[in-house]
Amino acid sequence: MEELGVNNSRLGIETIGLGKAANVHYNLLPAALYEHAIRNGEAVLTADGALLAETGQHTGRSPKDKFILRDANTDSQIWWDNNKPMSKEHFDILHQDMLAHVAGKTLFVQDLIGGADAANALPTRVVTELAWHSLFIRNLLIRPERAALADFEAKFTIIDLPSFKADPARHGCRTETVIACDFTNNIVLIAGTYYAGEMKKSVFTALNYMLPAKQVMPMHCSANVGPAGDSAVFFGLSGTGKTTLSADPARTLIGDDEHGWGEDGIFNFEGGCYAKTIRLSAEAEPEIYATTKRFGTVLENVVLDENRVPDFNDGSKTENTRCAYPLNFIPNASPTGRAGHPKTIIMLTADAFGVMPPIAKLTPEQAMYHFLSGYTAKVAGTERGVTEPEATFSTCFGAPFMPRHPAEYGNLLKELIARHEVDCWLVNTGWTGGAYGVGNRMPIKATRALLTAALSGELKKVEFRTDANFGFAVPVSVEGVDTSILDPRSTWANGTDYDAQAKKLVGMFIANFEKFEAHVDSNVLDAAPVLAVAAQ
């Protein structure tokens, strides 16, 4: 086996059973990874110098193919209602078969870190068979100083072999694709998918499992910090404006997707960003757009024209086109990835039913309720001829990545909010004046004005009313914002229609929360919306 690059010579990949590989490249820098990826036919150069790769049939994550090893250690720790178990026997066979699969192959290894807080960091070794995967994960995680690599000791390992096809009968999985997590021995096996995002989310899943035991809250959120050191956290599902609203020229970006909240404040899990590029433009998102023209950026499934210029409006391969780049490609990004305890938490929802106000103040109990609910609404696909909105509840704003029971995360968040006296706001970026198809999208100008007032602390000083359906506090008037949109019922042509829609949405919240009722305190149950009120 020929080994090249910089690494801890005492801990080569033979120590994790991969000694049959023909060549191993440790911690290659972007230029060398470009050379390998292009030479091997894995990727092509764009006109501006980014690296473009295609992921084949898997253009997104495969949540139905993700498993967690069920053993004595994890049996009582994992929320099995939401996570698929794999037996130790099946995991061990899969592991051994994947180790045998690397015989004679060239492998790429990156030694990286998940977590910008040294006390809670997860040193991670990622072994891939593709050079572009190696560059992708190098962009996304935190890169140690080169001098530190000689002493690097991984506490977590990912083996990513897209060319290995799993056998459901032999390996206890569902298809040829598998993501198998062993949290006892801290290893994840990824096979049968070329989608690079599986590696990123495997580290996130691991930290979501490990950190609550240390009383550190893992969060699927973006975060930024103001000039006075006032940090803010933005929870929200896809399409709610999490990335757009946290990108504020007046504030420093800490990170766009994954963070922890511990004893000393909040910290990014990552050292890069994985941004959607469909319909990306220089006008709407100039900072993200600029990264797509940088050497070192990885583009996924983006269509190129005849001059190799990306066409971000072309979703013919997938709507989930992406770019992966280091955080330092963003001009106002934090160099440390850390900030103090948040002053403000924003929970974003895109309510297509037109019921929610544009902003509401939450108590700690209401914040836990809405965090566990993880509500947004999606507009049904036109190909099905359906115009009714579809409610989506993804607990903790990231159910696929939460191995533990949601109440564990919710209770931890509630305690941190109360201890640090954090202001919590629910912000609706969805519809006003009626549901989707009748009303209009919430004006981004109004959302930004309300957000600015919330982050500055000014919004706390205005007069509030109690929402009749959800019980949270809604501002009566805010300077610079049209007062009419603050009361959603008044924006509807017919108040009775609004009441019926509100009753419908409240019923969905109540039905969704039934599974959590036995796991939360009575004061959190008291924070639920009230169906009887909505029915009046």
UniProtKB/Swiss-Prot annotation:
Q: Which UniProt keywords apply?
A: ATP-binding, Cytoplasm, Decarboxylase, Gluconeogenesis, Lyase, Manganese, Metal-binding, Nucleotide-binding
Its cellular-component GO annotations read: cytosol
SUPFAM superfamilies recorded for this chain? PEP carboxykinase N-terminal domain (SSF68923), PEP carboxykinase-like (SSF53795)
Describe how the cofactor binds.
Binds 1 Mn(2+) ion per subunit.
- UniProt-annotated location(s): Cytoplasm
Please give the positions of the paired cysteines in each disulfide bond: none
Q: Which domain of life is it from?
A: Bacteria
Q: In which pathway does it act?
A: Carbohydrate biosynthesis; gluconeogenesis
Q: Which GO terms describe its molecular function?
A: ATP binding; metal ion binding; phosphoenolpyruvate carboxykinase (ATP) activity
Q: Can you state which reaction this protein catalyses?
A: oxaloacetate + ATP = phosphoenolpyruvate + ADP + CO2
Q: Which Gene3D superfamilies does the UniProt entry name for this protein? A: 3.90.228.20, Phosphoenolpyruvate Carboxykinase, domain 1, Phosphoenolpyruvate Carboxykinase, domain 2
Name the positions where substrate binds: R61, Y195, K201, R322
Q: Could you say which EC number(s) this protein's record lists? A: 4.1.1.49
InterPro entries reported in the protein's UniProt record: PEP_carboxykinase_ATP, PEP_carboxykinase_C, PEP_carboxykinase_N, PEPCK_ATP_CS
Q: Where does Mn(2+) bind?
A: K201, H220, D257
Question: Which positions bind ATP?
Answer: K201, H220, G236, L237, S238, G239, T240, G241, K242, T243, T244, E285, R322, T447
Q: Which GO terms describe its biological process?
A: gluconeogenesis
Q: Which cofactor does it need?
A: Mn(2+)
Pfam families membership: PEPCK_ATP
Record family assignment: Belongs to the phosphoenolpyruvate carboxykinase (ATP) family.
Q: NCBIfam families recorded for this chain? A: pckA, PRK09344.1-2, PRK09344.1-3, PRK09344.1-4
Q: What is the role of this chain? A: Involved in the gluconeogenesis. Catalyzes the conversion of oxaloacetate (OAA) to phosphoenolpyruvate (PEP) through direct phosphoryl transfer between the nucleoside triphosphate and OAA.
What's this protein's name? Phosphoenolpyruvate carboxykinase (ATP)
Tell me what organism the protein belongs to. Allorhizobium ampelinum (strain ATCC BAA-846 / DSM 112012 / S4) (Agrobacterium vitis (strain S4))
Mind giving the lineage of the organism this protein is from?
A: Bacteria, Pseudomonadati, Pseudomonadota, Alphaproteobacteria, Hyphomicrobiales
